[in-house]
Amino acid sequence: MARFGVDEAGKGPVLGSMFAAAVAGDPAAVPDGVADSKRLSADRRAELDDRVRASMRVGVAEVPVDRIDDPETDMNTLTVAAQADALGRVVADGMAGYVDAGDVNEQRFGRRVANRVAADVAVTAEHGADDEYDLVAAASIVAKVARDAHVDALAAAFDADIGSGYPSDSTTREFLAAYVREHGELPECARASWQTSRDALGAAEQSALDEF
């Protein structure tokens, strides 16, 4: 019986989009070796992504920086919308499955996702679902590969090493600081509402004052 799994990647980075992925099909057809994408190498994720796409239905939704920075929304709402968008691409009435909960209240998150999908589906949201269910783990891989490709494209566009895009990554912070010093503004791929972006702008302003 076909079921589904949904997860997202890129909720926390200061650079670039967030991606959600939904995978639907027979759970028994999930490729061997699927595990939470964060524990796999990039090459292994790409290999499994190809195998998942060859054997399952896959939907991917992107949430760009301008939507993330919109003051009229929040990350929980955007995560619900992205998961529902991806899920709506692969499901039909009567299907059931699991999504990785992006809210402290799992039941509320699951209801919100289900309510945004046109098909009549049964959604169960759980924290850490990518560790428990192969279909969610497969969706985690697809979402992370989409995010990886996005970061690679950004690095190529800026002709620079931008790191992973996460605030904890020193390469990302160095790229952001250097860009702001040179251009006097954030790169378009930066989430301006993130504290890391504000810090980069503040440091550049302070440096300019010190030089004056």
UniProtKB/Swiss-Prot annotation:
Pfam families: RNase_HII (PF01351). One of its GO terms (cellular component) is ribonuclease H2 complex. Its cofactor is Mn(2+); Mg(2+). It comes from the Archaea. Keywords: Cytoplasm, Endonuclease, Hydrolase, Manganese, Metal-binding, Nuclease. Residues 1-206 form the RNase H type-2 domain. Manganese or magnesium. Binds 1 divalent metal ion per monomer in the absence of substrate. May bind a second metal ion after substrate binding. A divalent metal cation binds at D7, E8, D100. GO terms for molecular function: manganese ion binding; RNA binding; RNA-DNA hybrid ribonuclease activity. The keyword Chloroplast does not apply. It is found in: Cytoplasm. One of its GO terms (biological process) is DNA replication, removal of RNA primer. Belongs to the RNase HII family. This is Ribonuclease HII. It comes from Halobacterium salinarum (strain ATCC 700922 / JCM 11081 / NRC-1). The gene is rnhB.
